[in-house]
């Protein structure tokens, strides 16, 4: 391995790289970041420089908001914390780096919950705001993952569980006026789909800014919304896990009852919002007609763990990896590319076509839930290539050129960079007690330039400092300065938190052949893309081999 790359990582000062701090609380944020041990270095290209620029801008997105504790803000022109994004998927990613900020962000929504159970759709300097619902990523999933990553604090879990239970009741009471079991959209902003043709001829906000009311003079409202319904389905599945963990055994807090409610939501989703011919989820309007706009609703529903792997693979072939649909050069578009209503312009807040960074950070869970690891990297490479030339960290990208679009210092794009680097070539802790060491490097799809060349990454886990080096000759894992594993590039090594080898995963479209050097043994293997090989007693054995779903063009 390159000694110079090791020296570069080990001598790297995060403090020096991010420069002068501006806010009083930034000093504490830097201290917490350094406690995570996370550092990233690259042998060439601009990605290392952009990485620390992103970290510096991340601190700008953290400030007291509606209370005394610093919480995550959306950033850019969005001065506040939104439940659909900042308070869920953004905070879920941030939890691996600055857990105290994520926890404060989650708790701020519980703190500001209305007496009737409604959670604010956003929190600003002026306090909580309730005029719409605005749901996408299930809050319960984000909370559950934070709980698993950081000490399993049952006091935190109970506070959030009770708040989310009350919110579930509010949605069932006020957002099922048609009695279908679906969750209804009363306005565009209920789903955060600004300017999407999905909501043409629908008001931006609920009637008179009352989240429990819709315009009864509308010829098409309310919509039975697949993304809102899928959110509640997934939410209820995670609430069942929480109820079981908290020992709740009766009444509304019974985990069996939560699973029954989740099943009802799933049944309603498929009965009312799924079109079998198109194999797609659509809103159903008040006249019982499908709103046939193919949008990123699909990715949202998939990220809510709806359907089995075969179902998801069909979605990949027909839509998510289809270059006529959502698999643009810089994926994923917010409207299908072959829809005549598709509008690629990214210079303003739009869900009418451009690739939004919120879609990019929601995507990994949808893919990884079904072990589609290789296919996910095909989104990582172009997006990191675009971010490699980032100057502003925008909300949107032009899906054809990757040029930066609307706004700047936007926390989803900042967190996208941190997350994609860790998933592609870093060390990622999982709430189930696994560590992922991924032996890939960013690949520049633009003009043949180099983004990073060889990479180095480190992270502190339970008092041990782990390092991962990805070079042209292969990959190396160190613990507390000592090499514990070497292996060929193109695989992901899965260990426990103590560094004990559990399995490897093929991360390339090509078969990877070579040997793992571990505990004094040279262990030969050949692993296909997405194949998982378990390790036991000095040997690898196949756990699963699901093959690869390839891009489609028609």
What are these regions (language model features)?
Residues 1-22, 121-138, 169-256, 290-292, ...:
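The feature captures the catalytic groove of carbohydrate-active enzymes
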Residues 1-80, 104, 205, 268, ...:
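Low-complexity, Ser/Thr/Pro/Gly-enriched N-terminal "stalk/linker" regions
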Residues 4, 9, 54-66, 97-120, ...:
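Long, well-ordered core segments of solenoidal/helical folds
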Residues 37, 41-53, 96, 114, ...:
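Active-site acid/base region of carbohydrate-active enzymes
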Residues 39-48, 94-106, 147-165, 178-179, ...:
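Structural helix-adjacent loops and short alpha-helical linkers that scaffold large soluble proteins
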Residues 45-50, 172-187, 224, 231-311, ...:
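Catalytic cores of carbohydrate-active enzymes
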Residues 79-106, 111-196, 229, 353-367, ...:
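Aromatic-rich carbohydrate-recognition surfaces in CAZymes
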Residues 81, 132-135, 139-149, 280-319, ...:
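C-terminal capping/lid segments that line or modulate ligand- or cofactor-binding pockets
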């Amino acid at each position: 391995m390159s000694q110079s790359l090791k020296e570069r990582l080990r001598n790297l000062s995060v403090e020096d790289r991010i420069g002068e701090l501006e806010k009083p609380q930034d000093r504490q944020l830097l201290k917490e970041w350094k406690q995570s041990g996370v550092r990233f270095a690259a042998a060439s290209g601009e990605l290392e420089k952009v990485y620390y620029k992103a970290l510096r801008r991340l601190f700008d997105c953290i400030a007291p908001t509606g209370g005394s504790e610093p919480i995550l803000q959306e950033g850019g022109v969005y001065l506040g914390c939104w439940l659909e994004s900042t308070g869920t998927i953004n905070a879920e990613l941030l939890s691996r780096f600055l857990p105290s900020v994520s926890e404060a962000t989650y708790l701020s929504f519980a703190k500001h919950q209305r007496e009737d159970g409604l959670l604010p759709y956003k929190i600003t300097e002026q306090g909580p705001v309730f005029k719409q619902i605005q749901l996408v990523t299930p809050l319960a999933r984000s909370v559950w993952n934070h709980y698993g990553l950081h000490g399993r604090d049952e006091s935190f879990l109970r506070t959030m569980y009770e708040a989310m239970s009350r919110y579930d009741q509010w949605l069932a009471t006020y957002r099922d006026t048609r009695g279908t079991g679906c969750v209804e959209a009363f306005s565009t902003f209920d789903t955060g789909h600004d300017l999407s043709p999905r909501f043409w001829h629908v008001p931006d906000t609920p009637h008179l800014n009352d989240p429990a009311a819709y315009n009864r003079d509308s010829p098409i409202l309310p919509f039975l919304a697949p993304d809102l319904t899928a959110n509640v389905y997934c939410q209820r599945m995670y609430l069942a896990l929480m109820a079981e963990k908290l020992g709740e055994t009766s009444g509304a807090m019974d985990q069996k009852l939560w699973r029954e409610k989740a099943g009802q939501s799933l049944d309603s989703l498929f009965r009312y919002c799924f079109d079998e011919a198109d194999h797609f989820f659509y809103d159903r309007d008040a006249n019982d007609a499908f709103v046939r706009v193919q949008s990123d609703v699909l990715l949202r529903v998939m990220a809510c763990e709806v359907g089995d792997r075969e179902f998801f693979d069909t979605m990949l072939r027909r839509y998510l990896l289809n270059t006529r649909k959502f698999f643009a050069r810089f994926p994923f578009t917010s409207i299908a590319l072959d829809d005549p209503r598709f509008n690629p312009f990214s210079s303003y807040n739009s869900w009418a076509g451009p690739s939004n960074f919120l879609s990019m950070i929601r995507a990994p869970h949808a893919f990884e839930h079904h072990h589609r690891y290789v296919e996910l990297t095909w989104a990582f490479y172009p997006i990191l290539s675009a971010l490699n030339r980032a100057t502003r960290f925008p909300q949107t990208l032009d899906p054809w050129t990757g040029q930066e679009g609307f706004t700047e210092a936007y926390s989803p794009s900042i967190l996208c960079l941190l997350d994609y680097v860790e998933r592609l070539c870093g060390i990622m802790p999982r709430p189930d007690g696994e560590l992922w060491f991924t032996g890939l490097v960013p690949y520049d799809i633009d003009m043949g330039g180099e983004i990073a060349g060889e990479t180095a990454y480190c992270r502190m886990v339970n008092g041990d400092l782990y390092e991962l080096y990805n070079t042209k000759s292969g990959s190396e894992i160190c613990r507390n300065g000592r090499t514990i594993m070497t292996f060929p590039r193109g695989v992901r090594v899965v260990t426990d938190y103590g560094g004990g080898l559990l399995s490897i995963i093929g991360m390339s479209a090509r078969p990877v052949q070579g040997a793992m050097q571990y505990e004094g043994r040279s262990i030969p293997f050949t692993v296909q893309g997405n194949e998982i090989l378990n390790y036991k007693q000095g040997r690898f054995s196949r756990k699963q081999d699901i093959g690869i779903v390839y891009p489609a063009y028609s």
